[in-house]
Amino acid sequence: MNTSLKPGTTLYVGTAIDTIWSQIYYHVWWPGQGNDPMYLMNQSMNRTRNNYYENNYTPHMYTNGKDSGSGTATWISDPKTYLEEVGLYEINLIGTRSGNEISFDVKMNAIETTPTSQDLRLFVATVIDTVHYPASPNGLTEHHNPVIALLTGNTGKQMKFISGITYTESFTWSMPSGWINHADISWKSSGLKAVAWIQNYKSKEILQVNEFGFN
């Protein structure tokens, strides 16, 4: 999946998508020995999200909540189907970083008021752009965009939007000590970023997403 962001590779999605999409990764406890540190450092979150998507194999990609499977053809084609869609929601993030601590605001608004029957949820993830794991049992020593934590909870925060109203959520977060002191992985705090998205919890469709880098 990582090669989809590398120009010149056969899996590259193209500049039209490269500049606008957000990729995040949840880690799993199988098929290997269950010793992936990016899974072990937040088992509850990784299990909750994998179970939500009913994921039972890896690698396994979802695009805006749609199952894109494990085939490289759909990894390339599925994101392109959303290029002409117009979103009804807007998300903007702004913040600062001091060492391993970040503070930021997520601002949201909607064109339409949320129907009472619709279950929309806000997810806000802290993510690191690159993690080096030289001792990886499966030989994949460089990992991109693993989710560290979900700041609105593993099942998100329910939101009801009123058209024309701006909603703000504020966060201050520090890198967990397990990540800072882990002997088997390395990363740079300049690679920290926050990713926020609004998701229809029933259909799994992601209605809007944005991210902010703290480098």
Which residue ranges define each predicted feature?
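Local sequence-structure signature of Cys/Sec-based thiol-disulfide redox active-site neighborhoods
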Residues: 1-28
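Short, conserved sequence motifs used for protein processing/export or organelle targeting and
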Residues: 22-215
